[in-house]
């Protein structure tokens, strides 16, 4: 588990500073940060960058795969809705990528078997009343570990 922070359209200096001071181990970019932003940030730090992409079309997938971020995160767009995007849009992706959006214990197994993501990103499905729920987090961790043992 790495300490990370989600940034949405932050000035490039902010994630660079927090990464370089080792306040966080990786930055997750969820705004309109383009490839120029990512290139600039990569000149300011050698720490891990994850860029989130809202997936609506195959063109969105192609754009994500071309990203210079260390990892890409494919999401349905609006966070915390519990909705998945159209998984049929996802081809076999050759680079490490994260799957997000509407994931919970009830669909983790099918998502991992079908899409083979490098990692999954869970948010609202492991919360109770808007706060992370340790029991739900453990349940999700156990579910992922069981799936990994099957693969």
Identify the residue ranges that each predicted region occupies.
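RNA substrate-binding interface of SAM-dependent RNA methyltransferases
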Residues: 15-21
